[in-house]
Amino acid sequence: MKKGSVGNVETKTYALPNELVLKSGKTLKEVNIAYETYGKLNKDKNNAILVFHALSGNAHAAGIHKTDGKLGWWDALIGPLKCIDTNKYFVICSNVLGGCNGTTGPSSINPDTNKPYGIDFPVITISDMVTLQKNLIDHLGIKKLFSIIGGSMGGMQALEWCATYPEVINSAVIIATTSSSSPQQIAFNEIGRRAIMSDPKWDGGKYYYKNQPSEGLALARMIGHVTYLSKDSMHEKFGRCLQDKNEYGFNFETDFQVESYLKYQGDSFTKRFDANSYLYLTKALDYFDLTKNGSLSDAFEKLSAKIMIVSINSDWLYTPEEAKEIVSAMSTSGINVKYHEIKSIYGHDAFLIENGQMSYIISEFLSEKIVENIMTKNFSTIYENETIKKAASLMVSKNITHIPVVSNENKLLGIITAWDVSKSIAEENSIENIKISQMMTKNVITAFIDDKIEKIAIKMQEYNISCLPVVDQNGLVIGMISAENITNTITI
């Protein structure tokens, strides 16, 4: 079948019913969040994927926007039969807090003054962005996200979700990012901010009814854009080629193609982005640090989701070494984490360019479901000195066919099934007097939380079993997985 587009889309807006309390302690009134959705939320509301955009992105991640006809910034990856398959998943992307594409930010109207906030807008953090996103997810009635996916600043948002709302996510793909902004990254952001604030048209951030500080914003974008490229990609794209001339001009006009390219990037950016938003979002990047309250592994101590960390070998803004630090911290916390390094000459921007590699990584990761994702955690157990009658009563009241037999420490000793109960009755024994220990199966086939679903399905078929206890490394029962669980998962 041919991969397709989600078609024409429009941006929706959700207005928070209450004030938003920020990390700084300040509050925002009348907060709006702009978002788009693709695909359908299923009946159980367990097929939602939340996608996060990078610094200059917006909620329009896929499809063709009804207002301007523009294609979504990740349209190559989101859509029917694409790696983020909208035939299977309900995909959500929102504009971040502090942005300038529909979500409340410095260009929004301050309800207290009826004028744009400007720099009266409170300084925000990545954590504040995530808090607003959680409000949106709650509004949509989603209790648990199938996955979260983001690159660069979007990767920071994904990490913040892992640390703040670990119980809400099943998995995460975290791309080309860091767990804390480095001095070098902060330095580039500060240079960009100074370029904007040094532009006379910035006027203390009060330029909304005049002209935007376009020269300062363009310069900030030029500086930032260099960090998204690599030495090799710039050499391949531009070399030392001149722009529309054969000889040097011997003046301070544009000579080289790379100069013309950066000027174009800067000028075009001013037509779609707000200068004050650039100040606020880069400041949020600077403040991002998951290690500030202790070790990085401590930030993930409650995380049980499976994780994919992706880096780019030529990325010098958020290096592979920084990605590996995240992998190490998660591994220390016992998290099921995988790592993939994209091979590309395109630097930081490769996650938006290398569509083939990104599609493979994401599709393989999303389709690789493990026991932990679907097992039943609310299950019944029984002791070996209890009776078959007790087991029969449990099976009827709970509508189950398999009950793990455990010790006082919850260690697996055996399993009792509906077949065992039926056998006792058929043999005309008094089930009131028969102990579980007399009828239970002691050699139990089990599953572990990180087993692949495909492996468990094969095991069930091989042994003609419809339900398995899930145990940890100490043999303690932590869940149950049934053929029905697996069937329901395959249909997502």
Swiss-Prot record:
Entry function:
Transfers an acetyl group from acetyl-CoA to L-homoserine, forming acetyl-L-homoserine.
Q: Could you tell me which pathway this protein works in?
A: Amino-acid biosynthesis; L-methionine biosynthesis via de novo pathway; O-acetyl-L-homoserine from L-homoserine: step 1/1
What GO terms are given for molecular function?
A: homoserine O-acetyltransferase activity
Location in the cell = Cytoplasm
Domain CBS spans what residues?
Answer: 375-431, 440-492
PROSITE patterns given in the database record: CBS (PS51371)
This chain's protein is named Homoserine O-acetyltransferase
Q: Which residues form the AB hydrolase-1 domain?
A: 47-352
Residues recorded as binding substrate, renumbered to this chain, are: R221, D349
Q: Which CDD domains match?
A: CBS_pair_arch_MET2_assoc
Query: Which NCBIfam families does its entry note?
Result: homoserO_Ac_trn, PRK00175.1
Query: What Pfam families does the record tag this protein with?
Result: Abhydrolase_1, CBS
Identify the species of origin: Methanococcus vannielii (strain ATCC 35089 / DSM 1224 / JCM 13029 / OCM 148 / SB)
Please give the InterPro entries that the UniProt record associates with this protein. Answer: AB_hydrolase_1, AB_hydrolase_fold, CBS_dom, CBS_dom_sf, HAT_MetX-like
Q: Which catalytic reaction applies to this protein?
A: L-homoserine + acetyl-CoA = O-acetyl-L-homoserine + CoA
Q: How does it assemble?
A: Homodimer.
Please report which protein family the annotation says this sequence is part of.
Belongs to the AB hydrolase superfamily. MetX family.
| UniProt xrefs under HAMAP family | MetX_acyltransf
The Enzyme Commission number assigned here is 2.3.1.31
GO BP annotations, alphabetical order? homoserine metabolic process; methionine biosynthetic process
Keyword set for this entry? Acyltransferase, Amino-acid biosynthesis, CBS domain, Cytoplasm, Methionine biosynthesis, Repeat, Transferase
What is the main EC category here? transferase
